[in-house]
Amino acid sequence: MTQMDDAKNGIITEEMKIVAEKEKIDIEKLRKLIAKGYVVILKNVNRDTNPVGIGQSLRTKVNANIGTSPDCVDIELEIKKAKIAEKYGADAVMDLSTGGNLEEIRKAIMDAVKIPIGTVPIYEVGKLAREKYGRVIDMNEDLMFKVIEKQAKEGVDFMTLHCGITKQSVERLKRSGRIMGVVSRGGAFLTAYILYHNEENPLYKNFDYLLDILKEHDVTISLGDGMRPGCLADNTDRAQIEELITLGELVERCREKGVQCMVEGPGHIPINYIETNIRLQKSLCKNAPFYVLGPIVTDIAPGYDHITAAIGGALAGYYGADFLCYVTPSEHLRLPTIEDVKEGVIATKIAAQAADVAKGNKLAWEKETEMAYARKNHDWEKQFELAIDKEKARKMREEIPSKEEKACSICGDYCALLMVEELGKR
């Protein structure tokens, strides 16, 4: 039984109770949202995960991507990244490793943190195919499903699977006139497979079998957007929307099977198209939780893409995106460092909080109100406690202190709050 099955049957699970308490939402309302597929709870039955709820009426959640590459394989470094992501408030981590012993790396990360862990199984499939047959495109159906089942048994909580890439969508891509083609790595693996073998995507062709595997372990499927645009110039084009229509159909099949699902989205979107993208997804995918990468709102800021993504993420969250995948300062440039991971998580947490405030979330507003009173009362310890980055706030205040203990060194004796307070005492 999955969380969705239980919810449909009127059963309130321990995981639902935990999420309801965290989110301060009525448990019966939460159960109904899960039954409809509007909320998912990330929690594999085989792993001792702290369950996380994502979707309608809940706070906007944040994911951090980590993982090795063929050029940089350091398990201890990835463990540190996972821990720093968890420390600064990431709600989930995805292990996107492509270098080294992927099973060993994945298990080490899963042991290091309690938050949900996601993967993109096709990466391991491609790596194994290359090692066994010489090329990624020589992967086969049997290998794909063996890897997916193995990861499900290991305890992976959610998986990105690019089931919406089809022979038809690849043909439409060819005619699209895109500048950048396919920029999703998993999407590229499957597009190349279709083009080379002239066969349908096995994940689409055997979707019911895939759902049977995921259902057994209550793995949430994150329907990947392999046709997402890789630049603003390609945004919201026919190839992207073709895939989204297919994903909407697959959402309905997930719900019929009782498998929890969410849908992934772009990517690179100009600000004036963010609302359009969110509304399209929510309509076509029947209010399935929406998981967006950023989105980045300008392509000319390499080194600062945590900022471009936070701008887009705040707007996307406000318009209805439920899950924001962070972007680090090193995006498009190199593998992220520990500091990059920290900066990416913090920037995206800021975006999520801004979105939740705009949506009127009670928990978000409680924090804002507490901070207002802490500043009014010159309660610096409370301000540090409420800060998204507590250490940085404390460090910056201590670097250039004020002679006036209650004030900061921007105003010192001329602190506006103190001045009016003194006059008010007369």
From Swiss-Prot:
The residues that the entry says bind [4Fe-4S] cluster are 408, 411, 415
Superkingdom to which the source organism belongs: Archaea
Required co-factor(s) are: [4Fe-4S] cluster
E.C. numbers: 4.1.99.17
Q: Indicate the secretion signal residues.
A: none
One Pfam family matching this protein: ThiC_Rad_SAM
What the record notes about the co-factor is: Binds 1 [4Fe-4S] cluster per subunit. The cluster is coordinated with 3 cysteines and an exchangeable S-adenosyl-L-methionine.
GO biological-process terms attached to the record = thiamine biosynthetic process; thiamine diphosphate biosynthetic process
The record's top EC class is lyase
Any one Gene Ontology molecular-function term assigned to this protein's record = carbon-carbon lyase activity
Tell me yes or no: is Mitochondrion among this UniProt entry's keywords: no
Q: Which InterPro entries does the entry link to? A: ThiC (IPR037509), ThiC/Bza_core_dom (IPR038521), ThiC/BzaA/B (IPR002817)
The catalytic activity, as recorded, is: 5-amino-1-(5-phospho-beta-D-ribosyl)imidazole + S-adenosyl-L-methionine = 4-amino-2-methyl-5-(phosphooxymethyl)pyrimidine + CO + 5'-deoxyadenosine + formate + L-methionine + 3 H(+)
Q: So where does Zn(2+) get bound?
A: 268, 332
Where does the chain bind substrate? 65, 94, 123, 162, 184-186, 225-228, 264, 291
Keyword terms of this UniProt record: 4Fe-4S, Iron, Iron-sulfur, Lyase, Metal-binding, S-adenosyl-L-methionine, Thiamine biosynthesis, Zinc
Pathway given for this chain reads:
Cofactor biosynthesis; thiamine diphosphate biosynthesis
Chain's role? Catalyzes the synthesis of the hydroxymethylpyrimidine phosphate (HMP-P) moiety of thiamine from aminoimidazole ribotide (AIR) in a radical S-adenosyl-L-methionine (SAM)-dependent reaction.
* Entries under NCBIfam families matching the protein: PRK13352.1, thiC
**Entry similarity comment:** Belongs to the ThiC family.
Name this polypeptide is given: Phosphomethylpyrimidine synthase
Q: Which organism is it from?
A: Methanocaldococcus jannaschii (strain ATCC 43067 / DSM 2661 / JAL-1 / JCM 10045 / NBRC 100440)
